């Protein structure tokens, strides 16, 4: 952070940790809570909230709220979304395993939900090719999702 600011104070510095807070601390050994409560670490954080609303481990809305509530300084919240899951089963989601396959507007609902949070400043989509060069099997689902997303932008 300091090196970036010394080079150009206008450049924003941020990170994109996984969305599961427990994994960050206990498996990645990163102290995101400290970075979001003290100055001098980040300008923005883009947690990879690649979970659906019905995910059994990390439901989307609750996870976004947790990230927002951790911010005790001026860090901006940019929510990382996962269009690469659109049209597919999410085998790790428990009760929400078919949510991405049967959606149609899940990305739009995610953006609308995140906008309610105090520190929300935008969203990022992971992965470019899943949106602009999707596999033919999920192309109709992606197009439907993009139409829904454009309506809320």
What are these regions (language model features)?
Residues 23-26, 54-58:
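A short glycine-/small-residue-rich loop at the edge of a beta-strand within enzyme catalytic domains
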């Amino acid at each position: 952070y300091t090196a970036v600011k010394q080079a150009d104070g206008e450049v924003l510095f941020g990170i994109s940790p996984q969305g599961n807070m427990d994994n960050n601390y206990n498996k990645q050994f990163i102290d995101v809570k400290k970075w979001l409560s003290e100055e001098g670490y980040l300008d923005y954080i883009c947690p990879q909230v690649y979970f659906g609303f019905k995910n059994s481990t990390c439901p989307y809305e609750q996870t976004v709220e947790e990230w927002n509530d951790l911010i005790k300084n001026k860090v901006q919240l940019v929510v990382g979304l996962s269009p690469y899951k659109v049209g597919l089963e999410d085998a790790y989601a428990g009760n929400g395993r078919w949510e991405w396959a049967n959606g149609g507007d899940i990305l739009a609902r995610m953006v609308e939900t995140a906008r309610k949070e105090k520190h929300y400043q935008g969203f990022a989509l992971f992965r470019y090719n899943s949106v602009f060069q999707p596999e033919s099997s999920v192309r109709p689902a992606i197009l439907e999702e993009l139409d829904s997303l454009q309506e809320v932008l």
